[in-house]
Each structure stands twice: as C-alpha cells, then as structure tokens.
Amino acid sequence: MAKKVINVVKLQIPAGAATPAPPVGPALGQAGINIVGFTKDFNARTADQKGMIIPVVITVYEDRSFEFITKTPPAAVLLKKAAKVDKGSGEPNTKKVAKVTKDQVKEIAETKMKDLNAADIEAAMRMIEGTARSMGFTVED
C-alpha cells in the first residue's frame, strides 16, 4: 500500500546552500520534516549547480518521511546568467537592458525542456523568448 501524502512544499533554494535558517527552516518545520536531513540531502544533490536557484518540490508522508524532486533553474535566472545582468528591466516595453542570442535561448530551452510543457525544442524556445522579452531583453539572431 502506498504511503499517504499529507503535505507538498514547494521552495526555491540556492543550490548547495540550504540552511535551517529562514525561509527554509520554518517552511519545513511547519510541514514536520527533519530539517537537517533535508538540508544535507539537498546540498549534496545540488553541489554541482552552485550559484543557481533550484526549485524543489518536497512531498511529506503521514509517517513524517519525505522525498523531494529538484527541477531546473527558472528561465529568468538562466537568462540573467546568459546576458550577464543582475536583474531585468522594470519597464520591459520601453527600456531594454540586455541582449541574448538565439543560440543562448536554444541552450536554455534544451536545459529547461524536461520541466516545460512544450512538444518540441522550437516551442520551448518561443517560451524562453517570451520570458526574455518580458524581462526587457532583446532576442537577436
């Protein structure tokens, strides 16, 4: 018989840098998760992605055990890294802050493909281009 799920917690945590301090500790404590166990597992699993924000979905079961799935970094984080900027534009329609190439967009789309709801790489690229435009980035050929 399958374990009964009592809670699902979604967080975005810097890779390899999960600590019991807020915001991670309180969110996990409320769910009844062993915080130290989670932070050790998460940091070990994401040690190779230092500097990235990693979305994680934690499933908590009735017996207080848990399992978690790490996802790919958000498209906005990957775009900012590719364009070498700290943040997007506050007014994306009027102020463009950076440029990204189609090759960079394709690379990001390939990275994100398993988490995107896209049938093929072209559809994924269109999604990433839309995110780039909404951040005030110009997509060039």
UniProtKB/Swiss-Prot annotation:
- Say which domain of life the source belongs to: Bacteria
Family annotation (Pfam families) = Ribosomal_L11, Ribosomal_L11_N
Instruction: Explain the post-translational modification.
Output: One or more lysine residues are methylated.
Task: Say yes or no: keyword Magnesium present.
Answer: no
GO function term, MF aspect, one: large ribosomal subunit rRNA binding
A GO BP annotation: translation
Describe its assembly.
Part of the ribosomal stalk of the 50S ribosomal subunit. Interacts with L10 and the large rRNA to form the base of the stalk. L10 forms an elongated spine to which L12 dimers bind in a sequential fashion forming a multimeric L10(L12)X complex.
Entry's family note: Belongs to the universal ribosomal protein uL11 family.
Q: What does this protein do?
A: Forms part of the ribosomal stalk which helps the ribosome interact with GTP-bound translation factors.
Q: Could you identify this protein by its name? A: Large ribosomal subunit protein uL11
